[in-house]
Structure formats: C-alpha cells, structure tokens
C-alpha cells in the first residue's frame, strides 16, 4: 500500500507562494522586495485555483512562483537590503531612546537613495545577466532613454532628489554627444507629447521621446518610488551602453565635465571629448643599434628592380583598357539604383534603396545658425550638431557655449525665428545709430541683408527628407506646410499625405467623386428646370390643339425621376438597355409635343465632361460587379473556415479603402479651393 500523500506538499500549493510568505522568506522589506522583482524580472503569477494554492487567499492575494523566490535567495543585493533593514531598525531604536546624536551618526552611515541619489550596492551583475550581448541592451534602450530624459526635465522634490536628476541629465548629454560624433541620428518629429528622435546604432533603430522644457508640475497621484526604481536600473544600463559606444569610436569615457559651465546652462558645451587612440594605426619602428643607419644602396637597387617588374603587368592592363574600342560588350558601372517591384499587382510595397548625392551628416555643415531667444535652444543645438553644423550662435540669455552671442555677426547665414513678423520701427537719431552698430542685438523686426530667416520646422523637415527645403515656405509669418511623421510606414491602399494625389487615386476616381457631388448639388435645379419646361409645353399644346389628348401625357410628372436616372450607370446590360429604351421613348414624346405645338425641337447640348463622368461611373460599376462575381466564384471552392477569413479580409480592406478615399476627396476639395499649403 502506497504512502498517503500529505496535503500541501505538491501541486499548486507547492508551486506558488504568496507575497507575504516571499517577503518573510527573503527577510527584506516590502519596498526592497518590489525593487528586487523589478530588477530581476520576476512577475506575479495567477494560479488556476487560488484556494488550492493557499487556503487563506482572497481575490487580491498576489502569488509568485516558488522557484523564482528560491532563485532570489542567492542574489547578492539581498544581503545589502538586509544590512539596510538592520541599520534602519537601529536608528528607530535610538530615536525611541531619545539619543538623537547616535541616530544622526547611524543616519550618516546609512545609504538612502531617496536623499543621496546613489546607493552602496551596484547593479552591474544584473545588467550583464539580463543583457548577455550588447545588441540586447540596444534593443531595450527605447524605454530607458524616454525615462531618463523625462527625469532630467523634472524639478527636484522629496521623492525625486536633485542628484538623481543631475545624473540623468549627465547620462543623456553623454549619449547625445555620441550621436553627434557618430552621425547616428536619423529622424525627429514634433508632437504634442514632446519631440521624438530616432537613431540607428549598429543596425538597431532606437526611438525615444523627450518632453518639452516647460515648467513641470509634479502631482501626488504618481508613484515616484516605483519610477525611481526603474530610473536606478536604467542609469546603470545607459552607463554601460555609453561606455561601450564611446570606446567603439575611440573616445575616453567618461568625458571631461566642466561643472562651472554647466551651472551657466552650457548643455552640450559643458563636456569635452578626448580620444584614446584605439583606432590609430601605429607605424612599425626599426630596431637599430642606437643610430639610424641608411639602407644598403645595392639592396635598394634590387628592390626597385623587382617592384618595376611587378608593376609592369598592371601598366599593360591599363593601356589595353584605354585603347579598347567603345563597342565591346563590357559591363559598365552605372549610378542608377535597381528598383524593387512587387511580384504581384496587389503585393506589398517593397522598401526601395535610396541614394542621396549629399551626405545627411553634412547637411548643415556649410551654414552658420543663430537661434533667437524664443526658440528651443537645446533640441535645435542637438539636431544641428548631429547633422554637421559646427557654428551655432544664440542670445546670451540662453546660456553659454555659443559660437557667437552677436546677432549682427556678418558670418551668420541662417537665423531661426519663432515670432510673428513685426513692422520695422522708424530710424533713430545718428547718435543712437552709432551705439547700435556695436550692440549685439538688432531692433525688433530688423533684418540683416543676405541672411535667411526661417521657422524651426524648417530644420526638422530638412533632416527628415534628407535635403534642404525651400526657405521661403518657412519664412516668419508664413503658413507652414504640414509637419508629417517620418515614422509611418507606407502601406498599399492607404492614404499617403506626402505623395501626389495623382499617384494614389484610382482610375477615373476624380470624375466619379465630382459627378457624385455635382449630382447631389444640381438635382434640385434639374428638377425645377424640367418641371418649368414641361409646364410651358403643356400650355402651348392646350392653346394649339384645343384640348387634344396626347398619349402618355399623364406620365409627365415622372420625367424628373427618369431624368435623374439617366446619370446612373446601372449594374448589368439589361438595366443599360432599359435606360436606353426609356431615353428613346422620352425623346419620341418630346418630338410629338414639338410637332403639335409647331415649335422646332431644341436639341440638348451634351456636356463632354458630364458624359465622361457618366461613363466613368458606369465603368467603375461594371468593374466592381465583375470583381464581386469573381470573388463569389472563388468562395464557392473554399471551405467554410477559409471563406470566413476571406470575408473578414475583404471587409477590412473595403473599410480601409473607404477611409483613404474620404481623405483623398477631402484633400482634392482643399486643393481645388486653393487653401492647401504649398508643397516642396
């Protein structure tokens, strides 16, 4: 007879453990347990039956895997947390005894990240454990950068210490310096939430969000303790990444930091980069007896003779290539790039290789920019430097680190302005003029001849399109072109605001949309005109025929609906023939009425544009009917499961096509009314 199984020793009761039991087993506090779970990647688990996992469990009880908690017992940080817990217990006992000096001494020995921003333990081994390779760390860098840039712009509070904010800002500026040196920044986008940046590092696309530098209001409904735990982990991660990136390009990490310039809001200018010569190729040194001896002349002559013999075949090949006729079938290098076409007419759009004559990293290298006081200096400076600009000036109130603070410097080629145009004030006296010549600021509304004035959006649109846009479209006070997101991938059938309308719309789509809108607008006018003409004709018939009845005169009230139906293309050949018969009967009726009244029949002029619209609608209706019939025939050969999937696909595609068609119609209407902003 087998041994009776004891309850609670196997199954869910053994596989799961409650949070209270886990904290008691690890002998740490609950906040430290939360930190440890976040750093190690331990998540709560939901058992199938909570009552089987724990009898005293409720709907709010949190469970973890027992093996995960057993794994945390071997973590080195647990010992540091236990020491911290014991030290806090000593402090509370000293305060209970009234020994304030002893409590202050213990407080100085304690490591409190909420006050100092730095702890005794380090997370290096956890970073190496969670990210075995450097590519894994780069793939998880999006949230890291977004969180650190967010905390770098927050004001210091009791929950967010100033040292933590300063460390976040320092790490972010170091990362920006690497992007500037390596020319890794690719795109940027201005949104309501903030500024999106995208960089490509070792083949990995990294996208992060930077908030605008407004005065942030910290509310109490945000748990900064949990966010601070993530920040503590991300600081260590970005420190690892920055070290690896700096050493890969031959720079010393960390770069030299000037605290005095940082206090003057120098930003990127507070750091000075130094090279460590990793990538330099050292020339081999000759081993001598102490004095440099010249080579043997006989040996040197033999070496020169051998070099001439080796280079002779290359010269012969060059001569033959020069004297070869142009008609030979030789492959010639071309600068054209192959275009990837889809395999089927309805296939996905393939990414096309791009070739730019200008290097994006040197897009602004030839220009000197000056940033006005109202423009955001930090993002503009970062983007301009990342795309090759070396000379950037701004007003002295924006901080240190500028190329020049003199707004009237003649070397400035572009000035970024974000204020409405102001009329130039009348000129002052000659004495005031002489003073203004040495001043560093211009009068409001004054313009320097030969300088290009642009709004900040010009810089973002230039880097996203990798070309210099027309500056007159971005002049101060001008209506700016739409700022489109560069991160949207093009999908066949969807509306693309950056592409011309003619390349997106279907065949005869414009005629169909115009005919539909005009028919709705002109239907009342046509009805009124037809009724008026019929009334005049009926009066003439009564006067001339003296009460003679005309066949079909009772159906005159139906002519207006028939007239409206003429513009409808129909759905089949039978309906088309019926429309033609009705049109012929109507024409015969009018001929009889004109003959009785003695008035010549006036032929109605056919508008070629209206006829083209009608033909386009008929053609589209016929094509749609053929596609529906083909689809129905295909569905007959499918199983029920595949038929349901196909119906869902067709429904979603039709919905997307309708949305894209509505957007194209709206754009077509705006362009016709002349309200659209000019496009480059």
Swiss-Prot record:
Start and end residues of each BRCT domain: 359-476
GO BP: maturation of 5.8S rRNA from tricistronic rRNA transcript (SSU-rRNA, 5.8S rRNA, LSU-rRNA); maturation of LSU-rRNA from tricistronic rRNA transcript (SSU-rRNA, 5.8S rRNA, LSU-rRNA)
Disordered, as annotated region: 312-334, 494-680
GO cellular component term of the entry, any: nucleoplasm
Record keywords: Coiled coil, Nucleus, Ribosome biogenesis, rRNA processing
Annotated Basic and acidic residues bias: 584-593, 602-626, 654-664, 671-680
Pfam families: BRCT, Pescadillo_N
Biased composition regions of type Acidic residues, renumbered to the chain: 502-528, 540-559, 573-583
SUPFAM superfamilies (alphabetical): BRCT domain
Localisation per UniProt entry: Nucleus, Nucleolus; Nucleus, Nucleoplasm
Disulphide-bridged cysteine pairs: none
Subunit field text: Component of the NOP7 complex, composed of erb1, nop7 and ytm1. The complex is held together by erb1, which interacts with nop7 via its N-terminal domain and with ytm1 via a high-affinity interaction between the seven-bladed beta-propeller domains of the 2 proteins. The NOP7 complex associates with the 66S pre-ribosome.
Role: Component of the NOP7 complex, which is required for maturation of the 25S and 5.8S ribosomal RNAs and formation of the 60S ribosome.
Stated family: Belongs to the pescadillo family.
HAMAP family: Pescadillo (MF_03028)
Protein name, entry field: Pescadillo homolog
